[in-house]
């Protein structure tokens, strides 16, 4: 990623499945900005309470302080005029207004970094993330390792009571290792109730 100093704002998206390193990459970019003495604000969706409600935390234990919010409007309202970098964790949990909020912040000259799942457990586009990917200047899609076969994993497998989840299960279910596995396209399974009834 080649960034021109003094340029207007822009949007960066860090996406991929669970365990692909999205939070670690967001934390890395935030820390680099802080080392450069840039004013940074970090936000995360209030639904994400897996590790700590007031921190963005990676599965590996890295963490950085964040402001928990429940809507994209909260982010726009709380961003200070002198903030140079706005980082947003768990972008997929936000309402569709996040796309416009990020665009307005970038138009105001801010560097906006959004990390989140690009696909839900079904393997379908998740919330505002695909729209953010379309309007972002920079998109990095990270991959994990399939927990079944060891191939490159781009999907998130939801596991309920040791079995793959059903297609019509609720889209949002906050969890970590006990609920989700990284999977490749071949090993990713989504059950359909009509198949079980045959």
UniProtKB/Swiss-Prot annotation:
Disulfide bonds: none annotated. This is Thymidine kinase. GO terms for biological process: DNA biosynthetic process; thymidine metabolic process. The lineage of its organism: Bacteria, Pseudomonadati, Dictyoglomota, Dictyoglomia, Dictyoglomales. Homotetramer. The keyword Transferase applies. InterPro entries: P-loop_NTPase (IPR027417), Thymidine_kinase (IPR001267), Thymidine_kinase_CS (IPR020633). The gene is tdk. It is found in: Cytoplasm. Keywords: ATP-binding, Cytoplasm, DNA synthesis, Kinase, Metal-binding, Nucleotide-binding, Transferase, Zinc. It holds the Pfam family TK. It comes from Dictyoglomus turgidum (strain DSM 6724 / Z-1310). Its main location: cytoplasm. HAMAP family: Thymidine_kinase (MF_00124). SUPFAM superfamilies: Glucocorticoid receptor-like (DNA-binding domain) (SSF57716), P-loop containing nucleoside triphosphate hydrolases (SSF52540).
